[in-house]
Amino acid sequence: MKADIHPDYHPVLFRDLASGKVILTRSTATSSKTETWEDGDEYPIIEVEISSESHPFYTGKQRIMDSAGRVERFNQRFANFGKSK
């Protein structure tokens, strides 16, 4: 591989604003804000609105949309459409 062409890959904290959970991982993203982690070291922190900690798909708190009522209303409205009177 060529030297000096890859972005800086370093430890970064990600804070989920919806749940408040903070995750330490590695990323090429950076931030001017820093925060001290549990190990005593200081890392850049990036705040995200939603992550796997708060997304309904990953938390199992999905809402199922009930479209049956809308389909029934559509069928009632157009039940006689195209039929001669």
Swiss-Prot record:
HAMAP family: Ribosomal_bL31_2 (MF_00502)
Subunit structure: Part of the 50S ribosomal subunit.
Protein name per UniProt: Large ribosomal subunit protein bL31B
NCBIfam families: L31 (TIGR00105), PRK00528.1 (NF001809), PRK01678.1 (NF002462)
One term of GO molecular function: structural constituent of ribosome
Protein encoded by which gene: rpmE2
Transmembrane segments: none
Protein's UniProt keywords contain Ribonucleoprotein: yes
One of the GO BP terms on file: translation
GO cellular component annotations of the record: ribonucleoprotein complex; ribosome
Pfam families reported in the protein's UniProt record: Ribosomal_L31 (PF01197)
Keywords: Ribonucleoprotein, Ribosomal protein
Entry similarity comment: Belongs to the bacterial ribosomal protein bL31 family. Type B subfamily.
InterPro entries tied to this protein: Ribosomal_bL28/bL31-like_sf, Ribosomal_bL31, Ribosomal_bL31_B, Ribosomal_bL31_sf
Superkingdom: Bacteria
